[in-house]
Amino acid sequence: MIEIEQYFEDYEVGSERVTGGRTITETDIVMHAMHSGDFYPHHVDAEFAKTTPFGQRIAQFSCTFSIGIALTASIVNKRAFTYGFERL
């Protein structure tokens, strides 16, 4: 884990954060459906999904977004998540 201390003013428009990669699996899709209640057939029904333009099940947006956020967890900005914590 890398710790940084970066303030709002330090971020530049267009800056990027490079992370490692991760494959979204069938298990990810099914588990996310169970956690979120998103059981639409194009996510969980393999036979139905074959009839779609994708030809297979597709991950929920919220699943891909969650995984994307998790990939950034290797860089921790102490200012971003503990600001004001000392006053609690």
What do the predicted segments below correspond to?
Residues 1-85:
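Hot-dog-fold acyl-thioester-processing enzymes
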Residues 88:
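Hydrophobic/aromatic beta-strand elements that line small-molecule binding cavities or substrate pockets
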